[in-house]
Amino acid sequence: MLNTLTILRRVNQRPLISVLKRTFVQSRIIRNESVSKKPILTQLEIARSKFSPEELEAARLAREAGLGWMKKLPTKWVPYLELMRLEKPVGTWLLLLPCYWAITMASYSIAAPLWVTAKAIGLFSIGALVMRGAGCTINDIWDRNLDNQVARTMERPITSGRVSVPQAVAWLGVQCFAGLAVLLSLPFECFYLGALSLPFVAAYPLFKRFTYYPQAMLSICFSWGCLLGFPAVGAPLNLWVAVPLFISNWIWCLTYDTIYAHQDKNFDKFAGIKSTALAWGDKTKPILKGLTVAQGGFYAVAGIMNSMGPGFYIAGAYAIARIYNQVLKVDLNNEKSCWSAFTSNIRTGFIFWYGILFDYILLLLGFI
């Protein structure tokens, strides 16, 4: 009798157990379906969610407004040209002008014919455009997860998703090949001196992650033309001239790029991006004043060692005064003021060059 009851209980429990099992499985399926229906945000969407719709729209409009002549080009081309910063030629000029100084000073030192100087200036102009573009592309590849945390840079091609990293790397290869073609058109000394600069160009974007002085590395890259200018016209590399000229330009670059960095300092604090703007803070202006005086001293040494004429010193003194006045007047807490001061350095760089060019022309005409 007991055995019969036990068997009946087990039989009655089996349907209950199977029902419970089915219910459990169905609940798991429903739960998984509900989880899978939740939207999966990309890293780009997560980053952009930190900004208000108004900030995102303002960044987009600012980017489109700055395209200028590039708006007339095919839409597919534009992001790649933006990687080169073709819509912002300030950096290209600031890279190129020290090359002009060195080329013209080297031509002055050996009384090189005008066509030799013009040829070198033409090749360096193409090279600076291409290699500055390559440097910006490298910077955007490294910084794609930092640029999306700063309002001014979140619309850059890689950060905004308009260009993928593999596409950017391929475009970098094209630019490097074009830069190599320019180098091969110059004397061999320019080739190996130019190749020595590549590690600095590649390493610069990493410096803002672990040091407050990435501007020091960038200044090395932007001063390298002071070394290349001499062999470009067939002159021996006179280190007594090239080194003080290099240091003078290094200081100048450190000055204007620190002013530039003050534009983003509030965003940089939260993004973990380091710069001299954050390192120096309220002491920035006194430091930049001292650096500008030192810049003038090294520039004068370069002129003395190259036996330059009056144009070099008159124009140089005026240019240094402009930089000092720029440091005095710039409002480091105002983005527009910082940008205006930064871009004014193009005119300052040309003033330096006009003084050197004046002496060179006087030499060719036989007045020096």
Residue ranges and their predicted role:
Residues M1-E64:
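N-terminal mitochondrial targeting presequence
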Residues W77, L81-E82, A134, T153-P244, ...:
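Intramembrane alpha-helical segments
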Residues L123-I126, R144-G194, F270-F312:
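Multi-pass membrane catalytic core of lipid/isoprenoid biosynthesis enzymes
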Residues T104-M105, L184-L186, F207, P231-A232, ...:
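Helix-loop junctions at the membrane-solvent interface of multi-pass transporters
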Residues S52-Y80, C136-V163, D257-G281, K329-S337:
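Cytosolic, membrane-interface loops and tails of multi-pass inner-membrane proteins
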Residues T92-C99, W171-A178, L218-L227, L288-A300, ...:
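Core segments of transmembrane alpha-helices
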Residues L96-W142, R152, G173-L183, F191-A202, ...:
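Membrane-embedded alpha-helical segments that form the functional core of polytopic membrane enzymes
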Residues L73-V78, V301-I368:
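Extended hydrophobic alpha-helices typical of membrane-associated regions
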